[in-house]
Amino acid sequence: MADKLKFDLVSPERLVLSADVDAVQVPGAEGDFGVLPKHAPFMAMLRAGTLSVQNDGKTQHFELDGGFVDVTPEGVTVLAESIGE
């Protein structure tokens, strides 16, 4: 089985998505970036834009209005001000 990335997408109102995924594309404040399993840890601010989640050949898109991302060896947590699909 290929490595997966533990991913949580959270808004102030609710947990929008919690899943093991292949990759995440994030709209960073200083430019878009991708996160794969075992990525180096860091935190970053997010700008308004599209977050993409890839898993098993399928992609989900979410519209964010900014927030923060926390990348750890265990996974990624996106805390967004608001989230639309």
What are these regions (language model features)?
Residues 4-85:
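Compact, glycine-rich, soluble single-domain proteins
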